[in-house]
Swiss-Prot record:
The encoding gene: rplT
InterPro entries: Ribosomal_bL20, RIBOSOMAL_L20_CS, Ribosomal_protein_bL20_C
Name recorded for this polypeptide: Large ribosomal subunit protein bL20
PROSITE patterns assigned: RIBOSOMAL_L20 (PS00937)
GO molecular function ontology, one term from the record: rRNA binding
Protein's UniProt keywords contain Amino-acid biosynthesis: no
Lineage: Bacteria, Pseudomonadati, Pseudomonadota, Alphaproteobacteria, Hyphomicrobiales
Stated family: Belongs to the bacterial ribosomal protein bL20 family.
C-alpha cells in the first residue's frame, strides 16, 4: 500500500483558516493555532449576534412606533391592543416603516385602533367589535 502524504491537505486547511482570519489583529492573522481559535470564536459571535440582531431590530421598531403613537395621544401597548381588537394584523416592522414614511396611513391605523378601544369601552365587553377587518 502506498504511503499517503498529507502536506497538500494540511496546507489547504491552513490556507482556509488564515483566509478567514484576514484582518485580525496581531498573531491571530498569521499563526495557525491562534488563527484557528480566533476564527472559531468569531463564528460563535456571528451565530449569537444573528439572534441578538433580531432582538435589537424589534426593540427599535417598538420605540419608533411608541414615539409616533404618542403624538396621537396613545401608548404603544394601548395601540397594539386596539389593533388586535380591530382585527388589523400588521407586523411591527411595517408599522415602524409606515410611521416614518407614510404618516397619513399610520394615522388612519391609529384612529382605527382608537375607535376599536372606545367601542369596546362603551360596550363593556372584551370581544371584537363589528368593524373588525377579517
Amino acid at each position: 500500500m502506498a504511503r499517503v502524504k498529507r502536506g497538500v491537505t494540511s496546507h489547504a486547511k491552513h490556507k482556509k483558516v488564515l483566509k478567514a482570519a484576514k484582518g485580525f489583529y496581531g498573531r491571530r492573522k498569521n499563526t495557525i493555532r491562534t488563527a484557528k481559535a480566533a476564527v472559531d470564536r468569531s463564528k460563535q459571535y456571528a451565530y449569537r449576534d444573528r439572534k441578538v440582531n433580531k432582538r435589537n431590530f424589534r426593540a427599535l421598531w417598538i420605540q419608533r412606533i411608541n414615539a409616533a403613537v404618542r403624538e396621537f395621544g396613545l401608548t404603544y401597548g394601548r395601540f397594539i391592543d386596539g389593533l388586535n381588537k380591530a382585527g388589523i394584523e400588521v407586523d411591527r416592522k411595517v408599522l415602524s416603516d409606515m410611521a416614518i414614511h407614510e404618516p397619513e396611513a399610520f394615522g388612519a391605523l391609529v384612529s382605527a385602533a382608537k375607535k376599536a378601544l372606545e367601542y369596546l369601552k362603551e360596550a363593556g365587553t372584551a370581544n371584537e367589535f363589528e368593524g373588525a377587518v377579517k
